[in-house]
């Protein structure tokens, strides 16, 4: 039952339906912003592609996968009968609206019986897009849903027909697949839907509509279907309770509260076998900001003490209170290359994290600009295809788009981005004990500016570099110590808390504005004489809870220890050294006149002796000269010995 040769007359392609109401079809699919305006392109989501039968508003196929918004474009499989349903059956279609004398009672297409399913395998089909009617051929009207968006030839962009319809701008290609079911008891008309390059670059905020038509003698039946994308996070965040910013600013918990308590069962004396009791699972307790800061410093100390105990005998570790709070050290490491998203890709923070300070030289992936080539000791161009590069444990990829534990090569190749493998360290500076004491010393002498070192420079490369160094020296066990892992957990907890605080602070702006407006209204009724401000406003009073008492107590104890140390210094100081602490100009005066005084003293001590020796030397030289002058006036007489012959 093959139709006439292409093209068929325009009138053969006309089918008058009542206008299909697409209210149930064009469903509003909310775009997932994942809690921020610009999510990281390497963020892995649960992406579901849904193919919907438009006429019946039923789901024909749903395919889910884990991936980024750039590479999560799988090959979709759907059966033609799932797209058609019962819409091609004679009992459903209205013969009164059918033109040119076609009668559906004698039609051999549809999915009602097994014979019709088999017959449908012989019909070619073509697909016309309805999401962009303006992209059709010039001077051609492709019609609407009642025409399947194929009112004229040239509107088709894909399909399985002898003239091989193609397009350079449509989002999908639809071809016929192979079926193993020869009896057609179930589905035997598989279709394969693949995304084109234009489809991978398109915005899928809402469903896209297409029309599919069979190529046969007479009227070509229509099937409308839509393709939509649904994006969801792996573990959607949950918020509970009131404002999460201010109430959690509590003092540090005591040391005894951090220890885990394990309940032990009393031994049984009746000889029966003790039953295993499942431990009760309790929800993790939310720690405060001060606990997180203390954990960062404590974890840094334990890691430094494990690597170099001599440096922790007497030192100060100071947590930097101004941005940047973290710094990255570029390292060389072996990353894992996987085709499926590893578990580390599924726990990416919702907010972008930017590292403003990266030092050292390490491994770089992608196209590195000249401005950042100094960070690269080894550069790799990456891999082709949909691969995921997971950083080693305790390390991250620092990219143009932010910090991420793993990167997608599809995103990296598409955006021309580059990444550097780094270790993440908190901004904790290392100082000698004298540095802190000088800030509380009352002496007026100006000391030289001390040199501050961050712990990251002292411990840089511990995660990956320590492995290579530990093979021959036996220090690899350092990487598995609880001290280093505690520092990593403390940094991860602090980053997670920072992320939650940013979201909660945004929600707290409303509460802050209410307090400001309340104060403004209080100024308007300044002369109110009864009831006070809160009673006049008939609102709850706002108070400020001051928790700085603990800080004042700690500073008082610190000043007391400094005072005792200063007294110890004074008791060991000599009387001459105490002169320099009397007055600020005394040190300058002594240093100015000390040189001339020493020269004058040396002249007075050794001058007479040197002068006497010089006078004596001159006298001796004069005597020698006088003797020479006198001998020049006389001649020596030759002596004669008479005894000699």
Curated annotation (Swiss-Prot):
Biased composition (Polar residues) is annotated at 252-275
What Gene3D superfamilies does UniProt report for this protein, alphabetically?
1.10.287.210, ENV polyprotein, receptor-binding domain (3.90.310.10)
Q: Which Pfam families match?
A: TLV_coat (PF00429)
Q: Which SUPFAM superfamilies does this UniProt record tie to the protein?
A: ENV polyprotein, receptor-binding domain (SSF49830), Virus ectodomain (SSF58069)
Outline which residue ranges sit on the Extracellular face. Answer: 37-589
Membrane topology, Cytoplasmic segments: 611-645
* Residues glycosylated per entry: 46, 61, 270, 305, 310, 334, 337, 377, 393, 413
Site (Cleavage): give the residues.
448-449, 628-629
Position of sequence motif CX6CC: 534-542
Q: What InterPro entries has UniProt attached to this entry?
A: FMuLV_rcpt-bd, TLV/ENV_coat_polyprotein
What is recorded about the protein's domains? Answer: The 17 amino acids long immunosuppressive region is present in many retroviral envelope proteins. Synthetic peptides derived from this relatively conserved sequence inhibit immune function in vitro and in vivo.
What is the name attached to this protein's record? Envelope glycoprotein
Origin: domain of life: Viruses
Q: State the span of motif (CXXC).
A: 315-318
Q: Which gene encodes it?
A: env
Q: Where are the transmembrane segments?
A: 590-610
């Amino acid at each position: 039952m093959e139709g006439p040769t292409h093209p068929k007359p325009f009138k053969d392609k006309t089918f008058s339906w009542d206008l299909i109401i697409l209210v149930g079809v064009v469903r509003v699919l909310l775009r997932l912003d994942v809690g921020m305006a610009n999510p990281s392109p390497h963020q892995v989501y649960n992406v579901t592609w849904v193919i919907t039968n438009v006429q019946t508003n039923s789901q024909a196929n749903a395919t889910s996968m884990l991936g980024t918004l750039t590479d999560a474009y799988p090959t979709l499989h759907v059966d033609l009968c799932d797209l058609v349903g019962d819409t091609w059956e004679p009992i459903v279609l209205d013969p009164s609206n059918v033109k040119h004398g076609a009668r559906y009672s004698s039609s051999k297409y549809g999915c009602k019986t097994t014979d019709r399913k088999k017959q449908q395998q012989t019909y070619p089909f073509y697909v016309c897009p309805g999401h962009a009617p303006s992209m059709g051929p010039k001077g051609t009207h492709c019609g609407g849903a009642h025409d399947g968006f194929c009112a004229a030839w040239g509107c088709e962009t894909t399909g399985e027909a002898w003239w091989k319809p193609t397009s350079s701008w449509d989002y999908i290609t639809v071809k016929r697949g192979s079926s193993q079911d020869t009896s057609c008891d179930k589905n035997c008309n598989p279709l394969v839907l693949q995304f084109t390059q234009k489809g991978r670059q398109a915005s899928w905020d809402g469903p896209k509509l297409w029309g599919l038509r069979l190529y046969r003698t007479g009227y070509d039946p229509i099937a409308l279907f839509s393709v939509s994308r649904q994006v969801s996070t792996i573990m959607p965040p949950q918020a509970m309770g009131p404002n999460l910013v201010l109430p959690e600013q509590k003092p540090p918990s005591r040391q005894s509260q951090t220890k885990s308590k394990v309940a032990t069962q009393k031994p049984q004396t009746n000889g029966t076998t003790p039953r295993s009791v499942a431990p009760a699972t309790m929800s993790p307790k939310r720690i405060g900001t001060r606990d997180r800061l203390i954990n960062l410093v404590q974890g840094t100390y334990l890691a430094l003490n494990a690597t170099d105990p001599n440096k922790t005998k007497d030192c100060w570790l100071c947590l930097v209170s101004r941005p940047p709070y973290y710094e990255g050290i570029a390292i060389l490491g072996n990353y894992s290359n996987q085709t499926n998203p590893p578990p580390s890709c599924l726990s990416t923070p919702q907010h972008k994290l930017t590292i403003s300070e990266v030092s050292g030289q390490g491994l770089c992936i992608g196209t590195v600009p000249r401005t950042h080539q100094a960070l690269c000791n080894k550069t790799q161009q990456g891999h082709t295809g949909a691969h995921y590069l997971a950083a080693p444990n305790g390390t991250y990829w620092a990219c143009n788009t932010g910090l991420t534990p793993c990167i997608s090569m599809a995103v990296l190749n598409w955006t021309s981005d580059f990444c550097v493998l780094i270790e993440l360290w908190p901004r904790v500076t290392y100082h000698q004990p004298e540095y802190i004491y000088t800030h509380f010393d009352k002496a007026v002498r100006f000391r030289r500016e001390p040199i501050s070192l961050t712990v990251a420079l002292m411990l840089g490369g511990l995660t990956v570099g320590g492995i290579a160094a530990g093979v021959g020296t036996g220090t690899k066990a350092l990487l598995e110590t609880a001290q280093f892992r505690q520092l990593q957990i403390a940094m991860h907890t602090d980053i997670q808390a920072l992320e939650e605080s940013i979201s909660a602070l945004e929600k707290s702006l409303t509460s802050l504005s209410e307090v400001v407006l309340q104060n403004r209204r209080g100024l308007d009724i300044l002369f109110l004489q009864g009831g006070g401000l809160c009673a006049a406003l008939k609102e709850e009073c706002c108070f400020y809870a001051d928790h700085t008492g603990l800080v004042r107590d700690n500073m008082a104890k610190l000043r007391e220890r400094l005072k005792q140390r200063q007294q110890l210094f004074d008791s060991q100081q000599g009387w001459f050294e105490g002169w320099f602490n009397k007055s600020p100009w005394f040190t300058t005066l002594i240093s100015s006149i000390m040189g001339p005084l020493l020269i004058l003293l040396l002249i007075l001590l050794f001058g007479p002796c040197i002068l006497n020796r010089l006078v004596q030397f001159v006298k001796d030289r004069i005597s020698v000269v006088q003797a020479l002058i006198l001998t020049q006036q006389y001649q020596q007489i030759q002596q004669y010995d008479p005894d000699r012959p």
